[in-house]
Amino acid sequence: MNKFKVLVLNSDMDGVGYHRILSPYSCFNHPDIEVDIRLLMDSTLPLHDEGFLSQYKIIVFNKSIPFRTPEYKQNFMEMVKRQNIKIIFDLDDYWVLSNAHPNYKMWKEQNAQGVVEQQIREADAITTTTKFLAEKIAEFNPNVTVVPNSVNLKEQQWISDKKRTEKVRFLWGGGITHLVDLRLLKPAFEK
């Protein structure tokens, strides 16, 4: 029996790309399913080659697949449809930005909100992080599943080596786009 092949397109190796795509799909282990994880920045990735794409049953991606032109995207979508390949779009964050967001101006200029909403409509299924996002996504595509963020606790970075102490330690990890969220914690630390 031939293995069921899944092409997982990863946009980066940090943050979202790592925790939503690379880590979970690297741990995926099923005897009848082969997961092929590729970096989108790999210039040898032939997403325009129907012969290459035809070996896969599912394509998974987060954020977007950066096509050079709308025609490339259209050709890709037509090939995927001809080959009956299912598209799973992983969406980890709300795509409607407030004007306080550092990328708001660029987001508006590039109609990024509209692009994300179109990707939601086009996908066969969407995975997301929370019930809140699932409800927002369902307005465009009802085939949405919550897959919470997770970490591989067997990785060295998560192996605890803590020493007992009376001190309270707090660790926060995130990018500049989460600064507004971090400010919500300020009153608790002022007590």
Map each language-model feature to its residues.
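Short beta-strand/turn micro-motifs composed of small residues
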Residues: 8-10, 91, 128-130, 148, ...
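An aromatic- and histidine-rich active-site surface loop
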Residues: 63-82, 182-184
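Conserved catalytic-core segment of nucleotide-activated headgroup transferases in glycan assembly
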Residues: 10-27, 36, 152-159, 163-191
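N-terminal pre-catalytic "stem/leader" segment of glycosyltransferase-like enzymes
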Residues: 1-67, 181
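Nucleotide-sugar donor phosphate/pyrophosphate-binding loop at the beta->alpha transition
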Residues: 43-47, 86, 97-118, 153, ...
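Membrane-proximal helix-turn-helix segments that form the acceptor-binding/catalytic region
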Residues: 75-82, 106-126
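Donor nucleotide-sugar binding/catalytic pocket of nucleotide-sugar-dependent glycosyltransferases
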Residues: 121-158
